[in-house]
Every structure is written in C-alpha cells, then in structure tokens.
Amino acid sequence: MAENETPLTAVKVEALVVMKIMKHCSQTFPTTATGSIVGMDVGGTLEITNSFPFPVVEVPPESHFDNAAANPAAAAPRAKANTVYQAEMIRMLREVNVDANNVGWYTSANMGNFVNMNVIENQFFYQKEMNERTVALVHDVSRSSQGSLSLRAFRLSPKFMTAFKENKFTSEELQKSGLRYQDIFVELPVEIHNSHLITSFIHQLQTPNIPAPTELPSSLAALESGPFVKSSILAPNFDNLALSIDPFLEKNCDLLLDSIETHHTETNNFQYYQRSLAREQQRISAWQQKRKQENATRAALKQPLLPEDEWQRLFKLPQEPSRLESMLNSRQVDQYARQIDSFVSSTTGKMFAVKGNLLPGETAK
C-alpha cells in the first residue's frame, strides 16, 4: 500500500514497445489506432514492457444501432468485448512469464488533436479506481513524420477526475473547485529504454571519420566545387535556407482557426443561455411582485392568501449547458498554439535573415 501511495513521476518505455506502437499507428493512419500497454510500477516509475492492439468491431452500414460509436477505434479501450479480450491477452502473457500488469492504453493522434471526449472517457475508464496507476500514451503520427518522435504520456488530474465523476461542470461548480483547462491532464516525462545488448551493439557501430578542417573557399565557384558539396553528408544543407512555409505549420494554423471558431460558438451558446435565464428571472420577479400585491389586497379583505411559491410550477428556468466541451476546446487551442510556437522558431530566423528585402524602405546591408 505504501508503494501505491507514491505518485507516478515518470514513464519508461521499452524501445520495442515504441516500435510496435509506431507501426500500428502508421498502418491505420489517418484513422485512430488504440491498444493496451502492460508493464509494472517500480518506485513511482511506470515501466512499459509490452503492448498489443485492440481489435475494432466494424458496424455494418445497414446497422440501425443508435448507440453505435461514431469512431469505433477511438472507443475500443472501454468496449465490453475488448475488456474481455484484454484480460485474455494478459492471462496468456503471464503464462509465458511476461510482465502482464495492465498499466494503461495508447492511441494515435494527428496534428496533436487528442484532446477530445473519447480520450477523456477512455482514461477515466482506466483511472476511475482508487490509486489506479495507468497512463495514456499519445503517439502523434504527423509530428513524428517530420523527423522527431512524438510520444507523450498523460493522466487525468485528481481535480478533474472528481469533477468528471460527479459531472459538475457548471460555472458555479468550476468557480468553487478552481478547475481550469490547464488542469485536465497531468503530463509525465517519457524515457525510452534499450536493453544492454542493443546499447552495446550501437556503441560498436562504426562512426564516420571526421574530416580535417579545411580553409574557407575564396569564391562561389570554389565553394561549389569543394568536397562538402559532393559529399553525401547532411550538413551543410542549403535546403534549410528555403523560405517556403512548412505545410505542417500551415495545417496547424488551419486547425487552430477551426478550434477558435468552435470556441466562439460555445461562447455564443452560453451567452444565449444567460440571456434566456435573465428573461425568465425578470418574468418570475414580475409575477412574484404581482402575487405580493394580490395577497396584500386579499389580506386587507380578510381573504385566504395565495401561495407565493407557485412560480416554480408556472415557470421553468433554462438548463445551464455543460462547460466541459468548452474546457476541452480551450485545452486543444492551447495544444495547437504550443505546436505552432515550436514550429515558427526556424521560419522566424529565416525571415529576419532577409529582413532588408521584406520591409519597405530598408535594404540589406
């Protein structure tokens, strides 16, 4: 029990598990891929040693199920059939002496669009038990295709778990609890671990010889005929100086604008609720004032008074919409903004390099 009370501080993933997750997510791209991860908890570090994908039950097009999920793969981790499948797989892994403790699930993402209700409900399904030490691994296929692996680990914060369990996402409840969109997820650092044999093999690989320093070329012709241009090494790579806008950055800007539009729609819906509530409250106040005057007249005539709480039967206050969707959308906007901020750093440097040719009235010196 004392070990279970230690909070999770990091996630260590075996390199083979990372490769299996990448392969599964790439094969199903652009649709969502989900699967289970197994391992063990060692001193607050969650070690993930194996994984396996979830089967997706395809709903036939002629099916008329009203409760069928719009995206079966995204809802697969909490499906009843997959719960049985996962238990059977873990039992088989134990028979071959493999670490078979359920430590969470993984999912694929595209352009960082993983902040949605499916991810929230799946992680809540795994994390709802007391001290349930599970994480959600998110692999962004589009981001990884740019050359750097994007694998992140998330848990739902205790504050959000309490609010989601009680379904308290009204403005009053959010003000009392102080829950913000930044408090939805808790991100844990991810470390990729290789076995000692693989590490030894990597160190035994031959490294390319470092060329001796050469003198600077005296002209452009000397630079073009130099050894660096004819070599196959990546640097210097003059393609990096191109000013073309990265299509990945352009797509992120489009997604950011769509999320901001959704945010404005949610804001307009909430403002409509506030106007409707104000109108109903004015009608109730007018009715109560009129009823008080009637009771004052009846009291003067020594007649029985009319009930003053009858307005609860005559009037119906509008139901406040849940603020959960607005919170998730705000967290998604923050995710897109962070991605764009990391992408524009290289482009900004190029723009400053040619500043004299871009700004009117200035020339390059």
Swiss-Prot record:
Signal peptide range: none
Keyword Protease among record annotations: no
CC terms in the record's Gene Ontology section: eukaryotic 43S preinitiation complex; eukaryotic 48S preinitiation complex; eukaryotic translation initiation factor 3 complex
Major site of localization recorded for this protein: cytoplasm
Keywords, sorted A to Z: Cytoplasm, Initiation factor, Protein biosynthesis
Listed InterPro entries: eIF3h, eIF3h_C, JAMM/MPN+_dom, JAMM_MPN+_peptidase_M67A, MPN
Coiled coil regions, renumbered to chain: none
GO biological process: formation of cytoplasmic translation initiation complex; translational initiation
Subcellular location: Cytoplasm
Any GO MF annotation of the entry: translation initiation factor activity
Residue ranges of every copy of the MPN domain listed in the record: 11-160
Domain of life: Eukaryota
Family to which the UniProt record says this protein belongs: Belongs to the eIF-3 subunit H family.
Quaternary structure, from the entry: Component of the eukaryotic translation initiation factor 3 (eIF-3) complex.
Primary role: Component of the eukaryotic translation initiation factor 3 (eIF-3) complex, which is involved in protein synthesis of a specialized repertoire of mRNAs and, together with other initiation factors, stimulates binding of mRNA and methionyl-tRNAi to the 40S ribosome. The eIF-3 complex specifically targets and initiates translation of a subset of mRNAs involved in cell proliferation.
PANTHER family linked to this entry: EUKARYOTIC TRANSLATION INITIATION FACTOR 3 -RELATED
Protein name per its UniProtKB record: Eukaryotic translation initiation factor 3 subunit H
